[in-house]
C-alpha cells in the first residue's frame, strides 16, 4: 500500500514541480502601473512541498496498523476487537 502511494505520488509531484517551474507569460495589468504590489499566488517553496510527499508512506503505514489492530479474527471466524475498543460500548457484540 505504501509503495503504491509512493509510486503514484512521484509522477504527480514531478508534474506539479514542472508546472511550477514554467515561466508564466501574462500581460501586465493596470494595477502594476499604479504601483499596487501583486498578490502572492503561491508562496511555498518547492522544498517545503517535498516534505509533504515524504509523509505519505508514514500515513499509510499508520492507517494500516490501526486497521489491523482494531479488527482481528478469532478461532471461530467471527470478528472481534483485539484491543476491546467497541466491547465496552456494545456489550452484546
Curated annotation (Swiss-Prot):
GO cellular component: mitochondrion
Domain of life: Eukaryota
GO aspect biological process, one term: oxylipin metabolic process
Cell compartments where the protein resides: Mitochondrion
Induction: Accumulates in cotyledons and roots after treatments with isoxaben (an herbicide) and 9-hydroxyoctadecatrienoic acid (9-HOT). Induced in leaves inoculated with Pseudomonas syringae pv tomato (Pst).
Keyword vocabulary terms for this entry: Mitochondrion, Plant defense, Transit peptide
Tissues and organs where the protein is expressed, per its UniProt entry: Expressed in cotyledons, roots and flowers.
The keyword Mitochondrion is annotated on this UniProt entry: yes
Transit peptide, from-to: 1-27
Protein name (Swiss-Prot/TrEMBL): Protein NONRESPONDING TO OXYLIPINS 2, mitochondrial
Organism from which the protein derives: Arabidopsis thaliana (Mouse-ear cress)
Amino acid at each position: 500500500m505504501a509503495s503504491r502511494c509512493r509510486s503514484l505520488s512521484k509522477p504527480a509531484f514531478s508534474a506539479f514541480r514542472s508546472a511550477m517551474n514554467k515561466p508564466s507569460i501574462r500581460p501586465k495589468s493596470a494595477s502594476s502601473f499604479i504601483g499596487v504590489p501583486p498578490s502572492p499566488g503561491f508562496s511555498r517553496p518547492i522544498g517545503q512541498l517535498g516534505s509533504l510527499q515524504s509523509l505519505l508512506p508514514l500515513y499509510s503505514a499508520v492507517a494500516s496498523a490501526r486497521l489491523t489492530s482494531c479488527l482481528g479474527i478469532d478461532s471461530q471466524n467471527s470478528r472481534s476487537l483485539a484491543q476491546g475498543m467497541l466491547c465496552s460500548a456494545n456489550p452484546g457484540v
